[in-house]
Design a protein with these regions (language model features):
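Conserved HGGG/HGGXW glycine-rich cap/lid loop of the alpha/beta-hydrolase fold
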Residues: 12-61
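Active-site loop/oxyanion-hole signature of alpha/beta-hydrolase fold enzymes
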Residues: 38-41, 50-89, 250
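Gly/Ala-rich beta-loop-alpha elbow adjacent to hydrolase catalytic centers
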Residues: 90-94, 98
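Flexible "cap/lid" loop of the alpha/beta hydrolase fold
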Residues: 103, 110-141
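Conserved alpha/beta-hydrolase catalytic His-Asp/Glu region
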Residues: 123-127, 142-198
Length: 259
Protein backbone atom coordinates (compact mmCIF):
# COMPACT_ATOMS: atom_id res chain seq x y z
CA UNK A 1 0.00 0.00 0.00
CA UNK A 2 1.38 3.40 -0.97
CA UNK A 3 1.98 5.56 2.09
CA UNK A 4 -0.18 8.65 2.49
CA UNK A 5 1.02 11.90 3.98
CA UNK A 6 -1.64 13.42 6.25
CA UNK A 7 -1.49 17.13 7.03
CA UNK A 8 -3.64 20.09 8.06
CA UNK A 9 -4.06 23.36 6.17
CA UNK A 10 -6.59 26.15 6.74
CA UNK A 11 -8.53 23.85 9.08
CA UNK A 12 -8.78 21.08 6.49
CA UNK A 13 -7.24 17.62 6.77
CA UNK A 14 -5.51 16.46 3.59
CA UNK A 15 -4.28 13.03 2.57
CA UNK A 16 -1.71 13.08 -0.22
CA UNK A 17 0.68 10.82 -2.12
CA UNK A 18 2.77 10.90 -5.27
CA UNK A 19 4.32 13.57 -7.47
CA UNK A 20 3.26 15.10 -10.76
CA UNK A 21 0.17 16.97 -11.98
CA UNK A 22 -2.29 17.75 -9.18
CA UNK A 23 -5.36 15.49 -8.88
CA UNK A 24 -7.79 16.66 -6.19
CA UNK A 25 -10.44 14.30 -4.77
CA UNK A 26 -13.59 15.55 -2.98
CA UNK A 27 -15.80 13.06 -1.15
CA UNK A 28 -19.56 12.89 -0.65
CA UNK A 29 -21.77 13.79 2.32
CA UNK A 30 -20.88 11.88 5.48
CA UNK A 31 -17.75 10.43 3.92
CA UNK A 32 -14.07 11.40 4.17
CA UNK A 33 -10.76 11.22 2.34
CA UNK A 34 -10.39 7.60 3.53
CA UNK A 35 -12.88 6.51 0.89
CA UNK A 36 -10.49 7.58 -1.89
CA UNK A 37 -7.73 5.15 -0.88
CA UNK A 38 -8.12 3.01 -4.01
CA UNK A 39 -7.75 6.11 -6.17
CA UNK A 40 -4.73 7.36 -4.20
CA UNK A 41 -3.10 3.96 -4.71
CA UNK A 42 -3.81 3.89 -8.43
CA UNK A 43 -3.07 7.46 -9.48
CA UNK A 44 -0.21 8.48 -7.18
CA UNK A 45 2.15 6.66 -9.55
CA UNK A 46 1.74 9.52 -12.03
CA UNK A 47 -0.04 12.31 -10.14
CA UNK A 48 0.21 14.25 -6.93
CA UNK A 49 -3.07 12.99 -5.49
CA UNK A 50 -4.68 14.98 -2.68
CA UNK A 51 -7.90 13.88 -0.97
CA UNK A 52 -9.45 16.48 1.34
CA UNK A 53 -11.81 16.10 4.27
CA UNK A 54 -14.41 18.80 3.64
CA UNK A 55 -15.50 21.05 6.50
CA UNK A 56 -17.65 19.06 8.94
CA UNK A 57 -16.11 15.75 7.85
CA UNK A 58 -13.28 13.50 8.99
CA UNK A 59 -10.46 15.34 10.71
CA UNK A 60 -11.28 18.78 9.31
CA UNK A 61 -12.82 21.66 11.25
CA UNK A 62 -16.30 20.96 12.56
CA UNK A 63 -17.58 24.53 12.89
CA UNK A 64 -20.19 25.94 10.52
CA UNK A 65 -21.47 27.35 8.30
CA UNK A 66 -21.86 24.28 6.12
CA UNK A 67 -23.34 25.62 2.87
CA UNK A 68 -21.75 24.52 -0.39
CA UNK A 69 -20.11 27.89 -1.23
CA UNK A 70 -18.39 27.89 2.18
CA UNK A 71 -17.15 24.32 1.72
CA UNK A 72 -15.77 25.33 -1.68
CA UNK A 73 -14.14 28.49 -0.31
CA UNK A 74 -12.27 26.35 2.22
CA UNK A 75 -10.81 24.26 -0.59
CA UNK A 76 -10.13 27.35 -2.72
CA UNK A 77 -7.93 28.85 0.00
CA UNK A 78 -5.73 25.77 -0.09
CA UNK A 79 -5.77 25.36 -3.88
CA UNK A 80 -4.87 29.00 -4.49
CA UNK A 81 -1.57 28.39 -2.67
CA UNK A 82 -0.60 25.48 -4.93
CA UNK A 83 1.85 26.08 -7.79
CA UNK A 84 -0.35 24.50 -10.45
CA UNK A 85 -4.01 23.97 -11.38
CA UNK A 86 -5.76 20.72 -10.54
CA UNK A 87 -8.04 18.20 -12.09
CA UNK A 88 -10.85 18.01 -9.54
CA UNK A 89 -12.87 14.83 -8.99
CA UNK A 90 -16.02 15.11 -6.88
CA UNK A 91 -18.62 12.59 -5.78
CA UNK A 92 -22.15 13.82 -5.01
CA UNK A 93 -21.64 16.65 -2.47
CA UNK A 94 -18.01 16.70 -3.60
CA UNK A 95 -19.19 17.31 -7.17
CA UNK A 96 -21.25 20.26 -5.98
CA UNK A 97 -18.22 21.65 -4.15
CA UNK A 98 -16.10 21.05 -7.28
CA UNK A 99 -18.49 23.15 -9.38
CA UNK A 100 -18.42 25.98 -6.84
CA UNK A 101 -14.63 25.72 -6.71
CA UNK A 102 -14.34 26.06 -10.49
CA UNK A 103 -16.58 29.13 -10.39
CA UNK A 104 -14.71 30.72 -7.47
CA UNK A 105 -11.18 29.94 -8.69
CA UNK A 106 -11.37 29.11 -12.41
CA UNK A 107 -7.66 29.60 -13.18
CA UNK A 108 -6.75 26.86 -10.68
CA UNK A 109 -9.17 24.22 -12.03
CA UNK A 110 -7.91 22.42 -15.13
CA UNK A 111 -10.90 20.12 -15.48
CA UNK A 112 -13.74 18.50 -13.56
CA UNK A 113 -14.93 14.92 -13.12
CA UNK A 114 -18.37 14.95 -11.51
CA UNK A 115 -19.59 11.59 -10.22
CA UNK A 116 -23.36 11.49 -9.69
CA UNK A 117 -23.32 15.22 -9.09
CA UNK A 118 -25.89 17.99 -9.31
CA UNK A 119 -25.89 21.56 -10.58
CA UNK A 120 -28.75 22.35 -8.22
CA UNK A 121 -30.41 20.84 -5.17
CA UNK A 122 -33.98 22.09 -5.23
CA UNK A 123 -36.09 19.05 -4.18
CA UNK A 124 -38.65 19.73 -6.88
CA UNK A 125 -40.31 16.31 -7.09
CA UNK A 126 -42.17 14.39 -4.37
CA UNK A 127 -39.60 11.59 -4.63
CA UNK A 128 -36.69 13.99 -4.05
CA UNK A 129 -38.49 15.61 -1.13
CA UNK A 130 -39.33 12.23 0.39
CA UNK A 131 -35.76 10.97 0.12
CA UNK A 132 -34.30 14.07 1.79
CA UNK A 133 -36.98 14.03 4.50
CA UNK A 134 -36.41 10.32 5.14
CA UNK A 135 -32.73 10.85 5.85
CA UNK A 136 -33.58 13.62 8.34
CA UNK A 137 -36.24 11.42 9.98
CA UNK A 138 -33.86 8.50 10.42
CA UNK A 139 -31.33 10.89 11.92
CA UNK A 140 -33.83 12.53 14.29
CA UNK A 141 -35.72 9.41 15.36
CA UNK A 142 -33.03 6.74 15.46
CA UNK A 143 -29.58 8.38 15.44
CA UNK A 144 -26.36 7.75 13.55
CA UNK A 145 -26.02 3.96 13.82
CA UNK A 146 -29.45 3.14 12.36
CA UNK A 147 -28.94 5.85 9.73
CA UNK A 148 -25.63 4.21 8.79
CA UNK A 149 -27.44 0.87 8.47
CA UNK A 150 -30.12 2.37 6.20
CA UNK A 151 -27.65 4.31 4.05
CA UNK A 152 -25.43 1.26 3.69
CA UNK A 153 -28.36 -0.71 2.33
CA UNK A 154 -29.26 2.10 -0.07
CA UNK A 155 -25.73 2.79 -1.33
CA UNK A 156 -24.35 -0.75 -1.46
CA UNK A 157 -27.20 -3.23 -1.99
CA UNK A 158 -26.80 -6.95 -2.47
CA UNK A 159 -24.70 -9.70 -0.87
CA UNK A 160 -21.71 -9.10 -3.15
CA UNK A 161 -21.26 -5.61 -1.66
CA UNK A 162 -21.46 -6.76 1.99
CA UNK A 163 -17.77 -6.00 2.76
CA UNK A 164 -18.03 -2.49 1.28
CA UNK A 165 -21.31 -1.92 3.11
CA UNK A 166 -19.73 -3.00 6.41
CA UNK A 167 -16.75 -0.65 5.96
CA UNK A 168 -19.05 2.23 5.04
CA UNK A 169 -21.18 1.76 8.17
CA UNK A 170 -18.18 1.62 10.49
CA UNK A 171 -16.60 4.74 9.01
CA UNK A 172 -19.88 6.64 8.92
CA UNK A 173 -20.52 6.12 12.64
CA UNK A 174 -16.93 6.86 13.65
CA UNK A 175 -16.44 10.02 11.63
CA UNK A 176 -19.82 11.80 11.79
CA UNK A 177 -21.42 13.76 14.60
CA UNK A 178 -25.21 13.92 14.57
CA UNK A 179 -25.44 17.71 14.99
CA UNK A 180 -22.87 18.42 12.27
CA UNK A 181 -24.29 15.90 9.82
CA UNK A 182 -27.78 17.34 10.25
CA UNK A 183 -26.48 20.88 9.67
CA UNK A 184 -24.74 19.74 6.48
CA UNK A 185 -27.89 18.01 5.27
CA UNK A 186 -30.12 20.99 6.04
CA UNK A 187 -27.77 23.38 4.22
CA UNK A 188 -28.24 21.68 0.83
CA UNK A 189 -31.81 22.54 -0.32
CA UNK A 190 -31.99 25.67 -2.45
CA UNK A 191 -28.40 25.49 -3.71
CA UNK A 192 -27.94 26.04 -7.45
CA UNK A 193 -25.20 27.04 -9.88
CA UNK A 194 -27.11 25.93 -12.96
CA UNK A 195 -27.50 29.45 -14.35
CA UNK A 196 -23.71 29.98 -14.16
CA UNK A 197 -22.53 26.80 -15.89
CA UNK A 198 -22.07 28.54 -19.23
CA UNK A 199 -19.04 30.38 -17.85
CA UNK A 200 -17.10 27.16 -17.18
CA UNK A 201 -14.63 26.73 -20.05
CA UNK A 202 -12.85 23.70 -18.58
CA UNK A 203 -13.58 20.15 -19.76
CA UNK A 204 -16.20 18.55 -17.53
CA UNK A 205 -16.74 14.79 -17.47
CA UNK A 206 -20.12 13.89 -16.03
CA UNK A 207 -20.45 10.35 -14.69
CA UNK A 208 -24.04 9.24 -14.14
CA UNK A 209 -24.39 5.64 -13.00
CA UNK A 210 -27.26 3.40 -14.04
CA UNK A 211 -28.81 3.10 -10.56
CA UNK A 212 -28.22 6.59 -9.20
CA UNK A 213 -30.95 8.54 -7.39
CA UNK A 214 -31.13 11.16 -10.14
CA UNK A 215 -32.42 9.89 -13.50
CA UNK A 216 -30.02 10.32 -16.41
CA UNK A 217 -32.43 12.56 -18.33
CA UNK A 218 -32.65 14.98 -15.42
CA UNK A 219 -28.87 15.03 -14.96
CA UNK A 220 -28.40 15.78 -18.67
CA UNK A 221 -30.94 18.59 -18.31
CA UNK A 222 -29.15 20.01 -15.26
CA UNK A 223 -25.80 20.16 -17.07
CA UNK A 224 -27.00 21.01 -20.59
CA UNK A 225 -25.52 24.52 -20.58
CA UNK A 226 -21.94 23.35 -20.00
CA UNK A 227 -19.96 24.32 -23.12
CA UNK A 228 -17.33 21.55 -22.89
CA UNK A 229 -18.90 18.47 -21.31
CA UNK A 230 -18.94 14.73 -21.89
CA UNK A 231 -21.17 12.16 -20.23
CA UNK A 232 -20.40 8.61 -19.13
CA UNK A 233 -23.03 6.11 -17.98
CA UNK A 234 -21.47 3.06 -16.29
CA UNK A 235 -23.35 0.38 -14.38
CA UNK A 236 -23.44 1.10 -10.66
CA UNK A 237 -25.04 2.88 -7.74
CA UNK A 238 -24.56 6.32 -6.18
CA UNK A 239 -21.20 5.72 -4.46
CA UNK A 240 -19.70 4.01 -7.50
CA UNK A 241 -15.99 4.75 -6.77
CA UNK A 242 -16.26 2.70 -3.56
CA UNK A 243 -18.57 0.08 -5.08
CA UNK A 244 -16.32 -0.66 -8.07
CA UNK A 245 -12.89 0.95 -7.58
CA UNK A 246 -11.32 -0.83 -10.55
CA UNK A 247 -14.12 0.21 -12.92
CA UNK A 248 -14.06 3.79 -11.71
CA UNK A 249 -10.27 3.99 -11.87
CA UNK A 250 -10.30 2.69 -15.46
CA UNK A 251 -12.81 5.34 -16.54
CA UNK A 252 -11.03 8.13 -14.64
CA UNK A 253 -7.72 7.15 -16.25
CA UNK A 254 -9.35 7.28 -19.68
CA UNK A 255 -10.83 10.72 -18.98
CA UNK A 256 -7.54 12.14 -17.73
CA UNK A 257 -5.57 10.67 -20.64
CA UNK A 258 -8.04 12.11 -23.16
CA UNK A 259 -7.27 15.61 -21.92
Amino acid sequence: MRRNQVMKSHGLALRSAGEGPLLLLLHGLGSSSLDWQAQIERFSERYRVVAIDLRGHGQSMQEGPFDVPTLAADVARWLDEQPEPAWVVGLSLGAMVALELALQLPHKVQGLVLVNGFSEFLLETPREQERHAMRLKWLRWFGMRPLAWWLGRELFPGPELAPVRHTFRLRFVRSNKKKTYRALLEALPGWSVRARLGSLWQPVAIISTSHDYLPLAKRVEQFASLPNASIHTPEGHHAWPAEDPAGFNHLLHRILETH
